[in-house]
Amino acid sequence: MKQFFALIAACVLAISPSFAQDAGDDFVEYGVGLAISPFGPSLNLTYNVDAKNSISAGFGFSPEVSAPDALLPDWDTPGGFSATGTSSWMGVFWRHRPLENDNFGVNLGMAAGQIENTLTAGIPFHEGEDPHTYQVSYTENPVMYFGLSYGLKPVKGLQVGVDVGVLSTGGASVEYTGHAEEMEEHEEEIELEMEDIRDNFAWTMLPNIQIGVSYGF
């Protein structure tokens, strides 16, 4: 979690110089942009209702990628787990800019899709065997989103922005996907490892940081 907040701070410092130049630009009704987040790249189409309110439709996906060890939790299970994941989603979001400085915004939204994670044990049950795996799936829809944003003003030209928030989900299902014969032999160990995954990985609230560029027209 410390790495997550450090990443947020670094992103804000890196992109903040690009905002000042837009202050005098004219309001526009439409924007199209690209963004990147832990859930993959996305295409975003925006309609600016007025200078204070925007509605966006987002479409995102991620091919199977490995999670950096630095972003994984401290596991209770000896050896821990490595993780890979895929995702696909679409959502509708409302951004409100309550302050005089239109860079600041509050985002509320609703999305539907799925997130599939495969966790591989660091230590197999038996020496010389392939390590066993678990499937962690978020498939309950819809999910809600709340975030705070900076940038991506509703003005003409290229804009840069960052959004930090959380996805509120119904939780994930955790399934053992290793060899069936090990289920009986190591039933107690498997239950303990699944409990570790539920407590430390399969959260109902998922943090998000999204960095995007958009062109207003």
Task: Identify the function of each model-found stretch.
Residues 1-25, 201-202, 217:
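Cleavable N-terminal export/targeting peptides
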Residues 13, 37-39:
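A short acidic Gly-Thr/Ser loop motif
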Residues 34, 43-47, 92-96, 108-110, ...:
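Residues on the lipid-exposed face of transmembrane beta-strands in outer-membrane beta-barrel proteins
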Residues 133-144, 148-159:
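Conserved, surface-exposed functional patches that form binding/active-site neighborhoods
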